[in-house]
């Protein structure tokens, strides 16, 4: 058979990303219907009903990170799905990852990278998108913890939550809202701020709602491990200060067990650090303490060998099984044995892309 007859028309990057977005929409709708959740409740705070309708009609492409955010609000783990993403989205993820790696051990460099990321977002759009802005405000809170007053930290944490949560009385209505791990992580900053304000009872009430949220909404363990360690770490700090030592140990040990079951290292180092400190303080079993110390040293060795910090933040978004669309196009061009000039011209001989633009993606 003539090889030319088997060659499909070259598709553009936009078409591939559009198809990827459509596939995510199908998965999203299937889960939404199965869980009997209204679209309005899931997109609330992130976009309007009309904007989501445009996406359903195919008039607008939603990025993989946005779909991931919406899926996580339903408690769905998205790292299992293979997706095609733009190079820009991969670059944005890597910049955020750099900030996460720096934030706890090199704050001056983290601050510099944060400003660069903000500037990059503002160059591309008139304002920073809601999900990205929430990330920036979380980092700002952590950078400002030793500088701002408790009241200012509380206001900043509430503004960070409001980036994606439209409900003004979210603290009272938390259990009725559909939130993902990144949003719950932001609400923990409000708990911390309330405690610093001396509002201990209110802080504990909110903390308890957040702690129960993943199980109340029946998140699978793989999703729970994205937020339980942060909940546990803050819980250990709060319970210690309130002299609730047994609760502090319990919440830490439960988090460690979850991480072990999921073969996850998210925040495992600070959890181990706190548990060792607690168990030594209260004279717990010697063998248990030695075992925890052994785990801690093992992680230190692994991180040192890979030149990674022991103390870091972790993103709730993932690029696992995500493929760069420009590389997909490049491979398609090679497999079809077409030149750059041929790829940049449609069937009528009209160029729709410059060779210079294609070279950038190649």
Where in this protein do the model-derived segments appear?
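A short, Lys/Arg-rich alpha-helix, primarily the initiator
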Residues: 2-35, 326, 331
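Short alpha-helical DNA-recognition segment
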Residues: 34-54, 338-346
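DNA major-groove recognition helix of helix-turn-helix/homeodomain DNA-binding modules
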Residues: 63-81
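Flexible helix-coil transition and linker loops at the boundaries of alpha-helical arrays
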Residues: 83-85, 119-131, 162-180, 215-225, ...
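Amphipathic alpha-helical segments of tetratricopeptide repeats
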Residues: 115-123, 158-169, 208-219, 253-260, ...
